[in-house]
Amino acid sequence: AVAAKLAHPERTVIAHIGDGGFLMTGQEMATAKQYNAPIVAIVYNNQGYNSIRMHQEAQFPGRQHGVALENPDFALMGESYGALGLKVTRDEEFLPAFKKALAANRSALIEVQTDYEYVTPNARLSELAGKKLAGD
């Protein structure tokens, strides 16, 4: 996202990332600040590496390992990088938070807290137990 903003500073750049991915790459918020390349990062916090958990559940129902996370406060983490930090816990909170992020004139991080059971908006892990997934 930072490279996209540097290449096209006139554009609004929005990064969508899961909590596990952000834990591995969140330092990009510091890079955005350092190079004055404000982005909006939307971090979906489901307290786990659920893309990995999804495959474990499909292949080994009820036997997930190493996929639950104890996460930091991502909104506060964004603030520590000089970004506007926002937290969303209900659907109706998202649009106002998104509008604030777009108007911030600096980077913003929106932490969207989601249920651990959801892998995607339409798929619950309990529904995947024992099902063959593409690539498995």
What does each of the following model-derived ranges do?
Residues 1-136:
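Thiamine diphosphate
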